[in-house]
Design a protein with these regions (language model features):
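Charged phosphate-binding loop/patch that engages nucleotide di/tri-phosphates or the phosphate backbone
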Residues: 101-138
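Mid-chain, well-packed structural core segment of small domains
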Residues: 60-98
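Short, acidic/turn-prone active-site loops that include or flank metal/cofactor-
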Residues: 28-35, 57-58, 80-84
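A polyampholytic, Gly/Pro-enriched intrinsically disordered region
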Residues: 49-52, 96-107
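Catalytic phosphate/metal-binding cores of nucleic-acid and nucleotide-processing enzymes, i.e., regions
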Residues: 2, 20, 24-27, 47-48, ...
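Acidic, metal-binding active-site segment of PIN/NYN-like and related structure-specific nucleases
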Residues: 38, 49-64
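Small/polar loops that bind or transfer phosphate-bearing groups
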Residues: 6, 54, 80
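N-terminal first-folded block
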Residues: 5-48
């Protein structure tokens, strides 16, 4: 069973929407203190074989966090977008088939970005999926 772990920066509503969409989700706050360093939770997520979700676009540039992703074999998906978390979560659920296809084709460790569909795509199809792009390693 695929388990998604949501970083604290995605709040409480994001994982609720994913759960309502049928995903198995573990929240940061259910396992760690608010001030737990990212490299510590990344280690645990990697050890458990979970898929990590974050909104932190800078994580790739933080050596200790990037190294934790690599060292602990973490599949990390960065949810990209300056939108309310509800919109980001709904777009993630809509994009899930592409996320699953990406996960099936890429062996951890990696960092990938998950994008919402463009406004033009959603104007044509309200349920248009977004896209997933490998970010690290290149």
């Amino acid at each position: 069973m695929t388990v998604y772990f949501t970083d604290r920066d995605l709040g409480k509503r994001f994982p609720e929407i994913l759960r309502a969409g049928g995903l198995t989700v573990e929240r940061h706050g259910d396992h760690f203190a608010h001030d737990t360093p990212d490299d510590a939770w990344l280690e645990e997520v990697g050890n458990r074989g979970w898929i990590a979700l974050t909104h932190d676009r800078r994580i790739r540039y933080k050596p200790n966090e990037r190294d934790a992703v690599i060292r602990h074999g973490v599949p990390l998906l960065v949810v990209v977008g300056a939108a309310p978390f509800q919109d980001l979560a709904e777009a993630f659920v809509t994009t899930l088939p592409r996320v699953e296809e990406f996960l099936a084709g890429h062996k951890p460790p990696f960092i990938a970005k998950v994008y919402r569909p463009t406004p033009g795509e959603t104007a044509k199809d309200r349920n248009a999926p977004g896209r997933v792009e490998l970010w690290y390693p290149r």
